[in-house]
C-alpha cells in the first residue's frame, strides 16, 4: 500500500485542494486482487487505490466514459495473420497505465484510510485515477495518440487494431486491451516501436505472448500454428462454484 501511494505521489496524480462548496468529493477505497498466469496460477498479489466512480455525477464530474476494447474477432484475426506471416508475437504491459493520462475534468476525491499522511485529505486529480469513470477512456485516447504520433493508423474494421505501414506493407500490428498491448510484426519494426513507446510511456516487455484477453496462447512456430484456450477462465469458474 505504501508503494502504491509513493507511486501515485511520484507521478503527480493529485494536488491537495479545498473542496468547492457546490461539489461533493468522490470517495476512494483499496482494492486487492490476485494476478494469474495462463494456467490460472496466482503470480502476484496487488493492492490498488481506486476512486468510487459510481458516486460521480454525470454532467458534473464525468462527461464521457466509453473505452473501446478489441473483440475476440480481432484476437483471432491477428493471431492467424501472425502465424501466416511468421511474425514476432509480443506482450507489453503499460505500468500504472491510467495515471499516465491527464484528467481533463475537475475531480475532487477524499483519500481513505491506508494512504499514510494523505489519509482523510481532499485532493484534486491531475491524472486519471483507477476507478474514476473516465480514466479508462483517457488512457485509451492517450495510447492511440502516441501510436498515431509514431506512424500508426487505426483500422477501419476495429478502432482497437492499429497498423504501421512502411513502403506500402503492413509491418506491425498493435491491439491495446486496457493496459495490455498485443504486438506483432517484423522483428526490426517491433524493436523500433518498443523504443519509441518507451520514450513516451513506462512499459514492461513480458516476452512472447502467452496470455491475453483471458485466453492462453500457445504457438508452434515450426508448424506455423497458434492455439488459444481458456484454461484459466475455466479454473476460475470451477473455483467460484466449488466444482474444482
Which role does the model predict for each range below?
Residues 1-244:
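Long, low-complexity, charge-biased intrinsically disordered regions
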Amino acid at each position: 500500500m505504501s508503494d502504491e501511494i509513493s507511486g501515485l505521489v511520484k507521478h503527480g496524480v493529485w494536488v491537495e485542494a479545498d473542496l468547492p462548496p457546490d461539489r461533493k468529493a468522490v470517495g476512494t477505497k483499496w482494492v486487492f486482487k490476485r494476478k494469474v498466469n495462463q494456467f490460472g496460477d496466482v503470480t502476484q498479489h496487488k493492492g490498488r487505490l481506486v476512486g468510487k466512480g459510481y458516486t460521480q455525477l454525470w454532467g458534473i464530474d464525468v462527461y464521457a466514459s466509453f473505452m473501446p476494447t478489441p473483440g475476440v474477432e480481432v484476437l483471432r484475426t491477428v493471431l492467424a495473420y501472425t502465424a501466416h506471416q511468421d511474425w514476432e508475437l509480443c506482450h507489453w504491459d503499460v505500468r500504472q497505465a491510467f495515471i499516465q493520462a491527464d484528467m481533463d475534468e475537475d475531480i475532487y476525491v477524499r483519500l481513505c484510510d491506508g494512504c499514510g499522511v494523505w489519509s482523510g485529505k481532499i485532493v484534486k486529480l491531475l491524472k486519471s485515477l483507477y476507478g474514476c469513470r473516465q480514466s479508462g477512456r483517457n488512457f485509451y485516447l492517450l495510447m492511440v495518440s502516441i501510436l498515431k504520433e509514431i506512424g500508426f493508423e487505426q483500422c477501419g474494421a476495429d478502432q482497437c487494431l492499429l497498423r504501421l505501414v512502411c513502403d506500402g506493407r503492413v509491418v506491425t500490428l498493435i491491439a491495446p486491451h486496457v493496459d495490455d498491448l498485443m504486438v506483432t510484426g517484423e522483428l526490426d519494426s517491433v524493436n523500433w516501436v518498443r523504443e519509441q513507446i518507451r520514450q513516451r510511456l513506462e512499459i514492461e516487455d513480458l516476452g512472447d505472448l502467452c496470455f491475453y484477453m483471458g485466453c492462453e496462447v500457445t504457438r508452434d512456430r515450426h508448424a506455423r500454428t497458434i492455439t488459444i484456450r481458456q484454461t484459466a477462465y475455466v479454473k476460475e469458474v470451477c473455483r467460484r462454484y466449488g466444482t474444482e
